[in-house]
Amino acid sequence: MLSSLFPHRKFIRLDGGMGSMLQKGGMPVGALPEVYNITEPERIIQVQKQFVAVGSDIIYANTFGANRHKMAKAGYSVQELIAAGIRCARAACAGTEAKVALDIGPIGQLLEPLGTLTFEEAYDIFREEVLAGQDADVIVIETMTDLYETKAALLAAKENSDKPVICTMTFEPNLRTFTGCTVASAAMTLEGLGADAVGVNCSLGPDELFPIVEEMAKWTTLPLVVKPNAGLPDPVTGEYLVDPAEFAQAVAKFAQLGVTVYGGCCGTTPEHIKAAYDLLEQTEIAPRDNIAIPAAVCSASEVVQIDQPRIIGERINPTGKKRFKAALQANDMDYILDQAVQQVDAGADLLDVNVGMPGIDEKGMMIRTVKALQSIGGTPLQLDSTIPAVMEAALRVYNGKPIVNSVNGEEASLQNILPLVKKYGAAVVGLTLDENGIPKKAADRFAIAKRILDRATALGIPKRDVYIDCLTLTASAEQEGARETLEAVSYTHLRAHETKAN
């Protein structure tokens, strides 16, 4: 979708460092740049015109901090600041093919569990920005360190706009963000949620960003974005230390990773941007066709590849557990969390979460349980409910890429569950049963597995994210059924590999 804006471009050209350009032009430390959209629009337009002049295809509106938290004392509404910011960018792009991006940065408050801002409150703040920026051509979510906050922003963009969305996060040299998010978790989660391009901005200089982008390239099929700083500023003078020629040489190296969206962040001037684009025009960009993305799920901080048998702890489930039922009725979260800790300590790779029982608010309990589990550790979750509304509530507040447990061959299940899996970028367990129960024959179970997989892939769910469970009963009770299960597993596995080869 992003490439359709510039169908004949070898690569998409972003702009450079608006904030540092304004500071260089005399903006006082501590001033709110977004207010300049109204009080000194020509100052903003003049900077943006310089980036248009050197070939930038997308100009970021001066709206990075235009949210109700950061602008509480600005004297102008979010709507006024964003509308003025887009007008400035549009004026700078006049007479060219350059597009305008609504620029959305962090709120400036930490989300729970690190802070007090709830996911729902963050979503509402970002929704206000998106609605105010409907006149933009593109939405950019940038300089994020918290995957949970990025998810709130991306959902707000996808649910309230039809514009392409670019998401870039800020990483440390250890390949994690300030809040501990891994590169793989960011790439998987944001692609699953519907971003049109993902990458890295700010953080460090271009050389230091290379291993981060190299890692990201392993975990996403989306176009990759890189928008580095001009190195780090001199602690005495405040001047950024990487000059345009050095910046261009370093940025051009990203072509070997197949990066197709380039720009600059703090300290990058029109000279930096022009030098980089001139060199990139002479540089071959590696194709990223037929990328083999690993089958995996994640929390923000932990990735579990499904490349070997994995242990899923299933004790967070009231079925047959009198004490657990009592904990749910009493809202005893300490007991539930203790069950989680015990399972992780015993070697569980993932935790199944099922809080369904009569007499409680299952949706509310599921939300509280998922949030509580995320507050004590990073073990990825498998979300388990037979009620679609409960499943969606859990998917919405989960921070990462979970497994949905489960979908089956019944038409109602396929219609209700698979769209949720697609929207929230989850993996899913497919059970080989339908309205008639569990088929006795392996071939019939395979037929259901194929039906599930066909419906999933038709929605755009990657085949690697569908885990087929061929089901079985206790072997001592039904020995022939156990044999059929083994045959179904073998046949499904064989056909899956044949399809992959083709």
Where on the chain are the PLM-derived regions?
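Active-site-adjacent loop and "lid" segments of alpha/beta metabolic enzymes
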Residues: 29-32, 98-129, 167-191, 212-213, ...
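Terminal amphipathic helices with adjacent charged low-complexity linkers/tails
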Residues: 268-300
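N-terminal small/glycine-rich loop or linker at the start of catalytic domains
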Residues: 2-38, 64-70, 97-119, 163, ...
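Conserved small/polar residues in nucleotide/adenosyl-binding loops
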Residues: 492-501
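Alpha-helix-loop-beta-strand connector modules within alpha/beta enzyme cores
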Residues: 76-96, 153-167, 215-228, 276-285, ...
